[in-house]
Amino acid sequence: MKPKDIVAQFVADIQAQRFDEAKALLVTDGFEYVGPNMRFVNPDDLMAYQFGMVAIQKALILRQLSAEEEQVFAILDYRTNFEPIGDVRLAVWFSVLGDKIQKVEAFYNAAVVENMLGGNLPSAS
């Protein structure tokens, strides 16, 4: 698969709550997720966080997907069942190495997510 297809499949797997399939698209060594208020260096930690968000996830809408070689950029709408927050727009940059995602950099309004989690963010360690 091309990098763009790998990322599209990853997003589809997260939306459908197929976390084992999504995790299989991530490298095991050298993985990194960086967001404005959290960081994961282990795919298991990212998947545990995603699993924890299932209760509020209404939909994950892929609005745009662009790629240049192994770099893939996605615009997503994270729709929630948590009415005080509503939807969160995300810009996500993926670096693909071979047939796996090596790095995920997410950009979004961190204050919204922090409020949604009641100020309890996962540890960055």
Residue ranges of predicted features:
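C-terminal and inter-domain tail/linker signature
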Residues: 1-125
